[in-house]
């Protein structure tokens, strides 16, 4: 880290993901200037991950790609996905954070999905497109996301990512507890 500057690379150009990373780091390191930059990073999984494991792997793949491209203090990747659990379909996001030689994985909250939405995803659509059609919105995935729509704005995609990032940062905030 340069003096009082933390450089963060986010494995996406999506402003929701970049803002979540910037907000989380500003909360965790208020004495530092946080320089956050997004970059396109391939996930190596389907555009709409349909399993927990594909979603997690997509975040890991994105963070590793970023590490190979540019120097930074921290690398963040967020991958949204869906799965059908015993209680029904839900969407969630995995967070992968790399700092030096350490990797931390976290996951955001689960948002239950209507069965009609899950069925459209099984048919090959992406969640953002399904939600845009259902709620007559445009490019919701770069705004409040399905979370914002289904919670009537009481939670957003960005707020979910921000909380998940803060939790996934625990090993970096307490390195002596995570050898």
From Swiss-Prot:
Query: Which coenzymes or cofactors are required?
Result: Mg(2+); Mn(2+)
| One Pfam family this sequence matches | NTPase_I-T
Q: Which residues bind substrate?
A: 71-72
Work out whether the entry's keyword set contains Metal-binding: yes
BP terms from Gene Ontology: nucleotide metabolic process; thiamine metabolic process
**Per the annotation, how and in what number is the cofactor bound?**
Binds 1 divalent metal cation per subunit; can use either Mg(2+) or Mn(2+).
Q: What is its EC number?
A: 3.6.1.73
Keywords on this record? Hydrolase, Magnesium, Manganese, Metal-binding, Nucleotide metabolism, Nucleotide-binding
State the InterPro entries in the record: ITPase-like_fam, Non_canon_purine_NTPase, NTPase/PRRC1, YjjX_NTPase
Q: Could you cite one Gene Ontology molecular function of this protein?
A: metal ion binding
**Enzyme's top EC category:** hydrolase
> According to its UniProt record, which reaction does this protein catalyse?
XTP + H2O = XDP + phosphate + H(+); ITP + H2O = IDP + phosphate + H(+)
Report residues binding Mg(2+): 71
- Which residue windows are coiled coil? none
Q: Does the keyword Hydrolase apply?
A: yes
Spell out the family assignment given in the record's similarity comment.
Belongs to the YjjX NTPase family.
Subunit text: Homodimer.
The function of this protein is: Phosphatase that hydrolyzes non-canonical purine nucleotides such as XTP and ITP to their respective diphosphate derivatives. Probably excludes non-canonical purines from DNA/RNA precursor pool, thus preventing their incorporation into DNA/RNA and avoiding chromosomal lesions.
By its UniProt entry, which HAMAP family does this protein fall under?
Non_canon_purine_NTPase_YjjX (MF_00648)
The name this protein goes by in its record = Inosine/xanthosine triphosphatase
Lineage, broadest ranks? Bacteria, Pseudomonadati, Pseudomonadota, Gammaproteobacteria, Alteromonadales
């Amino acid at each position: 880290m340069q003096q009082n500057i933390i450089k963060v690379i986010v494995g996406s150009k999506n402003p929701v993901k970049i803002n979540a990373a910037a907000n989380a780091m500003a909360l965790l390191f208020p004495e530092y200037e946080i320089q956050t930059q997004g970059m396109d990073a391939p996930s190596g999984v389907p555009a709409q991950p349909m399993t927990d494991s594909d979603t997690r792997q997509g975040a890991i793949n994105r963070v590793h790609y970023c590490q190979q491209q540019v120097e930074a203090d921290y690398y963040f990747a967020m991958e949204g996905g869906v799965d059908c659990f015993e209680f029904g379909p839900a969407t969630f996001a995995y967070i992968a954070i790399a700092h030096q030689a350490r990797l931390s994985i976290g996951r955001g909250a689960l948002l239950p999905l209507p069965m009609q939405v899950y069925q459209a995803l099984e048919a090959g659509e992406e969640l953002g497109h399904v939600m845009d059609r259902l709620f007559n919105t445009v490019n919701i995935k770069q705004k409040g996301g399905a979370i914002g729509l289904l919670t009537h704005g009481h939670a957003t995609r960005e707020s979910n990512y921000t909380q998940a990032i803060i939790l996934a940062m625990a090993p970096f905030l307490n390195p002596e507890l995570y050898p």
